[in-house]
Regions:
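A short glycine-rich, Lys/Arg-flanked "PGG" loop and its adjoining helix->strand segment in the class I
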Residues: 127-139
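Residues lining the SAM
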Residues: 113-115
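C-terminal lobe and adjacent flexible extensions of AdoMet/dcAdoMet transferase-like proteins
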Residues: 206-254
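SAM-dependent methyltransferase
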Residues: 144-217
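A short acidic, Gly/Pro-enriched loop at the edge of an enzyme's catalytic core
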Residues: 102-109
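Conserved class I S-adenosyl-L-methionine
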Residues: 1-49
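Class I SAM-dependent methyltransferase SAM/SAH-binding core
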Residues: 46, 53-100
Length: 254
């Protein structure tokens, strides 16, 4: 049986199995190193586009008060199931898109990991997301996010990737549009049912190849300062062949 659904619905149940090589612990360690550099002590954190909540739960286990948002109800269901096993204070999960961010109270740090910002394909949505993050950061607070680089997304044009687990098979077909500066992922997911039969679902994802100049301009227009762009999990400038950029920016102290 084949069914077409919107992004991160069918994939939600298999997402953790398909991303076992992400290295969440290393990324959490990196985030904490950045938090320690902040002149404002970081205790409250926003995890924007949190997915299945792995990073949000890791930070909660380390003592942070975490608010986590995502646009996919299915991903949030997985996240809340994961958080239910915590002995520490669990994250507060909110069902929101990035450009419609609205929190209960400001935070000292905001993160957006695993290239979620590249899912913002329209300049207006990118600008509004940055504006809202700025609005919900305390003065002196920090925004840290990563993106897939234009070099990586162009290199993915007309490629086929496969991920396989015991109960699922995921096939990704990718196409890059120079005109739109976007990479489209056509995803076929096959999941085995208890009776041995297989269900097939289709999702289409799209990411924008934002340039460094576009990101810096959008951050500046939102009010951010001290913008820094580095390679992945490092303090050095990115290489020309970098797959991922990490960007940090600060809301000025008022």
């Amino acid at each position: 049986m084949q069914e077409e659904v919107s992004r991160y619905q069918a994939l939600a149940a298999s997402y953790d199995e398909l991303t076992v090589d992400v290295g969440y612990l290393r990324r959490a360690d990196y985030l904490e190193r950045q938090f320690r550099k902040s002149p404002v002590p970081v205790r409250t954190v926003l995890d924007l586009a949190c997915g299945t909540g792995t990073m949000a739960c890791l930070l909660a286990k380390r003592g942070y008060e975490v608010t986590a948002t995502d646009a996919s109800e299915e991903m949030l269901t997985q996240a809340m199931t994961k958080a239910a096993a915590l002995t520490e204070r669990p994250p507060l999960f909110l069902h929101q898109t990035m450009p419609r961010l609205r929190l209960l109270e400001p935070v000292v740090a905001a993160i957006c990991t695993l290239e979620a910002v590249t899912y913002l394909t329209r300049p207006a949505d990118l600008q509004e997301t940055f504006r809202r993050v700025f609005r919900w950061l305390r003065p002196g607070g920090w925004f840290l996010f990563d993106v897939n680089t234009p070099w990586k997304l162009r290199r993915m044009d007309r490629q086929i990737y496969m991920d396989e687990t015991e109960e699922s098979l995921c096939v990704w077909r990718t196409f890059f549009s120079e005109k739109r500066q976007t990479c489209t992922y056509q995803v076929d997911l096959f999941r085995q049912r208890a009776d041995g039969a297989w269900d097939r679902s289709f999702e289409e994802h799209r990411e924008r190849a934002w340039t460094e100049e576009e990101l810096r301009q959008a951050l500046a227009e939102a009010g951010f300062t001290a913008v820094k762009l580095t390679g992945d999990l490092t303090s050095r400038p990115p290489k020309p062949t970098e797959d991922r950029w990490i960007i940090t920016a600060q809301r000025p102290v008022e």
